[in-house]
A protein has these predicted regions:
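Conserved catalytic cysteine-centered active-site region
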Residues: 58-112, 155-159, 225-251, 332-359, ...
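Active-site-proximal alpha-helical scaffold in enzymes
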Residues: 89-119, 162, 168-197, 258-265, ...
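Flexible glycine-/small-residue-enriched beta->alpha junction loops
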Residues: 112-166
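Active-site pocket-lining segment
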Residues: 163-165, 201-203, 209, 279-348
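Conserved active-site "lid/cap" helical segment
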Residues: 2-59, 63-64, 68-72, 76, ...
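Beta-strand segments within the central parallel beta-sheet cores of soluble alpha/beta enzyme folds
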Residues: 49-57, 83-88, 113-118, 177-184, ...
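Condensing-enzyme catalytic core mediating Claisen C-C bond formation in acyl metabolism
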Residues: 1-27, 228-293, 297, 362-363, ...
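N-terminal extracellular/periplasmic Venus flytrap/periplasmic-binding protein-like
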Residues: 14-15, 26-27, 32-35, 43, ...
Length: 395
């Protein structure tokens, strides 16, 4: 690749992650997206007019309105001449947006792109099917759009949590292992919050309410009181006698994250120093019911493309869709657990599904910077049986 076709990341930022119906709930996804787009462009040091395109992931689009990414771009103050694309690759949406940006730069089509993801699970609507034709008699039923469009496997007609139980049986991951992993996720996230290690990667969000404007400036999910004993006391959430609980799964969340991706030539021409170079990316998949094993395939595909081994990466950020998923994938790939999710993961921080891919990458970039490391790998599984992976090298 030449400098013109080498993709680099100039900036990365995320909102704090809000709890379900928490501090960020009054803001729809495009408004959350606008916050991070505006801040990512500011941090990158580029003029808004220099942006060629905005690409944002968003999964729960019901009721959001036309062109969510376009809404976010306009609300961020970008000129109306800049096109925008909304993508839905379920939990991989935010990272796939960055991959699409890198592809556009490698193809020579564009030089400066804002990419990321946004989600407000709190604002997902309920649906009433059949109302358009009219319900002539009998009862109608409300369908939870958040679950139907975000957390429900359409192939097996079952909740993601049931497939997590299937994953636990297939991989042999025990309840105790899941709870221990979840407790560690909270402990690491709480330690990171107390040490202000998330401060650099987050932008405070102003939320207008009846009592005036409040500012959300910290992640709402990490719990100091999380412990192995407390988690062990929770009942299974999806199957009687199962091992997956509300404690070893992520929450329902709101948040957004965005990155400015440019060519190396663009960065140099504007006197800007990139955070990192995008070195490789890949997707992978299997049967829909095996979605939680899909990162194994995606990461192996990336390693083959990059000619690297898993041990070559100083830090790994793997989305914690469930503790069982993270454990099954890590064991199969031979991760050094001391390098994985060093500041906690989605079980503690939260999983705003369309935003998580960009959030994971953003957290990885700042963790590499904070620990003075060089090479990083980000990966997520996603509903339908696929996964995404992307690697970076700091500059």
């Amino acid at each position: 690749m030449t400098d013109t076709t080498t993709p680099v990341i100039l900036s990365a930022v995320r909102t704090p992650i809000g709890r379900y119906l928490g501090g960020l709930a009054p803001l729809p996804a495009p408004r959350l997206g606008a916050v991070v787009i505006r801040e990512a462009v500011r941090r990158a040091g580029v003029e808004p007019t220099a942006v060629d395109e905005v690409i944002m992931g968003n999964v729960l689009q019901g009721g959001v309105g036309q062109a969510p990414a376009r809404q976010a771009a306009i609300h961020a103050g970008l000129p109306g001449t800049i096109p925008a694309l909304t993508i839905n690759k379920v939990c991989g949406s935010g990272l796939k947006a960055v991959m699409l940006a890198a592809q556009a730069i490698r193809a020579g089509d564009e030089q400066c792109i804002v990419a990321g993801g946004m989600e407000s699970m709190s604002n997902a609507p309920h649906y009433v099917y059949g109302m358009r034709a009219g319900i002539k008699a009998g009862n109608s039923q409300l369908v939870d759009g958040m679950i139907h469009d975000g957390l429900w496997d359409s192939f097996s007609n079952t909740h993601m949590g049931n497939l997590a139980e299937y994953t636990a049986r297939k991989s042999g991951v025990s309840r105790e292992d899941q709870d221990r992993f979840a407790a560690a996720s909270h402990q690491k996230a709480v330690a990171a919050l107390e040490a202000c290690r998330f401060k650099a990667e987050t932008v405070p969000v102003e939320v207008a309410g009846k009592k005036g404007v409040t500012v959300v400036d910290k992640d709402e999910g990490p719990r100091k009181d999380s412990s192995l004993e407390a988690l062990a006391a929770l009942q299974p959430s999806f199957e009687k006698g199962g091992s997956v609980t509300a404690g070893n799964a992520p929450g329902l969340n709101d948040g957004a994250s965005a990155l400015v991706v440019t060519s190396l030539a663009f960065a140099r021409a504007h006197g800007l120093t990139p955070l990192a170079r995008i070195t490789a990316y890949a997707t992978g998949g299997g049967e829909p019911k095996d979605l939680f094993f899909a990162p194994i395939v995606a990461v192996r595909n990336l390693l083959a493309k990059a000619g690297s081994a898993i041990g070559d990466y100083d830090l790994i950020e793997a989305n914690e869709a469930f503790a069982v998923q993270a454990l099954a994938d890590g064991r199969a790939l031979g991760w050094d657990w001391d390098r994985v999710n060093v500041n906690g993961g989605a079980i503690a921080l939260g999983h705003p599904i369309g935003a998580s891919g960009a959030r994971v990458l953003t957290t990885l970039l700042y963790a590499l910077q904070d620990r003075k490391k060089t090479r990083g790998l980000a990966t997520l599984c996603l509903g339908g049986g696929n996964a995404v992976a992307l690697s970076v090298e700091t500059m």
